[in-house]
């Protein structure tokens, strides 16, 4: 598309593996054309406010990140509906690559990329599939912060709870609300100066006000066309698609190798490991079925 002189809006994920996406980013840079990603969840007022508060620095440094995102429940019928679905050769991954690209993008957009990942990706844990449907990942950041990312397509009912612990409080995004547990003083300073062994800083809970806007796909499309016409900002630059995929690939690679993986990781090694699984990927016949997708996106 870039070689044909076209502007490009890419749906998530940007690709299956980062080496592939890096080539796309290079083609975009050479073309001089507008390149955007369909990261519509960045338009959600709650996540925009989290991004503003965390990156703005008013709450201090990140200490801990926790995201439980398990409200992706899928039946066996869902996986049987396509011969490509949930196969290494056809899709290249499971819940990390299909359901979680938006959350992995938001995680890195709000908190940044970790420096190290240790993940446990359970393949076919809840379904008769060859790719992962249950993942628990431990993250380490450059400043010493840690995190846990949990996802699954086997939990009913599922959970979507995103917590960011910072020096001046904690943000909790859940049930379409953003709560701030605001501390009266910096926890790190309090820890060093408090005289009582069981003292804790004073805390007040408040629901964070937002602008209430959540334009989703329309917002991304409007920003894309406005950028082409007027040069105004995109919701997400296309080159950023590689960042969430970096997290996904690092989790896969860590699980395959059974040890922590540093970011950036060896992209050639990742592709080598993926191709091993592609070669043994099983062929399956799809079931002819029609789904009601209301409320699934």
Name what the model sees in each region.
Residues 41-128, 258:
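Predominantly a Rossmann-like dinucleotide-binding segment in NAD(P)-dependent oxidoreductases
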Residues 235-272:
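A contiguous, mid-protein "functional segment" used to position or interact
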Residues 1-42, 57:
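Beta-strand-loop-alpha-helix segment that lines the small-molecule cofactor/substrate pocket
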Residues 141, 166-239, 261, 272-297:
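C-terminal glycine/acidic-rich active-site capping loop/insertion
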Residues 9, 34-36, 66, 118, ...:
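Structural detector of well-ordered beta-strand residues that form the stable sheet scaffold
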Residues 101, 126, 150-158:
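Glycine-rich phosphate/pyrophosphate-binding beta-alpha loops
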Residues 24, 50, 250-251:
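Aromatic/hydrophobic pocket-lining residues that form π-stacking "cages" and hydrophobic walls in ligand
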Residues 132, 137-143, 164-166:
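Active-site beta-strand termini and strand-to-loop segments that position acidic
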């Amino acid at each position: 598309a870039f070689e044909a002189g076209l502007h490009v809006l890419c749906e998530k994920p940007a690709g299956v593996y980062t080496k592939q996406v890096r080539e796309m980013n290079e083609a975009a840079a050479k073309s001089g054309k507008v390149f955007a990603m369909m990261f519509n969840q960045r338009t959600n007022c709650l996540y925009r406010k989290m991004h503003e508060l965390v990156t703005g620095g008013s709450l201090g440094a990140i200490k801990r990140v926790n995201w439980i995102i398990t409200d992706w429940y899928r039946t066996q019928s869902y996986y049987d509906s396509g011969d490509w679905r949930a196969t290494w050769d056809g899709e290249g991954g499971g819940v990390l690559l299909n359901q979680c690209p938006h959350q992995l993008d938001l995680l890195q957009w709000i908190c940044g990329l970790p420096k190290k990942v240790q993940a446990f990706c359970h393949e076919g844990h809840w379904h008769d599939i060859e790719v992962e449907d249950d993942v628990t990942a431990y993250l380490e950041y450059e400043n010493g912060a840690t995190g846990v990312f949990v996802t699954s397509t086997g939990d009913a009912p599922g959970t979507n709870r995103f917590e960011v612990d910072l020096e001046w409080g904690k943000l909790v995004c859940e049930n379409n609300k953003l709560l701030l547990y605001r501390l009266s003083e910096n926890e790190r300073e309090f820890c060093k100066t408090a005289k009582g062994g069981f003292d804790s800083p004073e805390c007040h809970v408040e629901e964070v006000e937002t602008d209430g806007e959540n334009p989703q796909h329309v917002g991304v499309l409007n920003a894309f066309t406005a950028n082409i016409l007027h040069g105004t900002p995109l919701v997400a630059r296309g080159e950023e698609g590689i960042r969430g995929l970096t997290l996904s690939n690092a989790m896969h690679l860590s699980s395959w190798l059974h040890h922590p993986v540093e970011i950036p990781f060896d992209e050639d090694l990742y592709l080598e490991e993926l191709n091993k699984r592609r070669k043994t990927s099983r062929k399956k016949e799809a079931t002819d079925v029609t789904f009601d997708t209301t409320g699934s996106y």
